[in-house]
Amino acid sequence: MNGGICSTCGLPKELCICEEVAKEQQRINVNVNRRRYGKEVTVIDGLDPSDIDLQELTKFLKGKLACGGTVKGSSIELQGDHRDRVKELLTKKGYSLDNIN
């Protein structure tokens, strides 16, 4: 059974800090693009999908921002201009503000 042990560091899931280390090392870019009909989309790039569960992070952001969104490749797309609020929410999730552009 491998349910309680981290596959990266070999420690029990309760003691594993792999995700926190990964959060501190990410260089995240938050941009707003215009799409069809002038709709704005906030794009979050620079996240490593092997270290962080992008689906879980997207679900968290969509719930807090009350907007639609999706994961495309290694980036997250959210409907609307949410640059400032996304930066605030990512810092609350444990990402370093210095690494968010």
Swiss-Prot record:
One of its GO terms (biological process) is translation reinitiation. It comes from the Archaea. SUPFAM superfamilies: eIF1-like. It holds the Pfam family SUI1. The keyword Hydrolase does not apply. The keyword Protein biosynthesis applies. Belongs to the SUI1 family. HAMAP family: SUI1. PANTHER family: DENSITY-REGULATED PROTEIN, DENSITY-REGULATED PROTEIN HOMOLOG. NCBIfam families: PRK00939.1 (NF002096), SUI1_rel (TIGR01158). This is Protein translation factor SUI1 homolog. It comes from Methanosphaerula palustris (strain ATCC BAA-1556 / DSM 19958 / E1-9c).
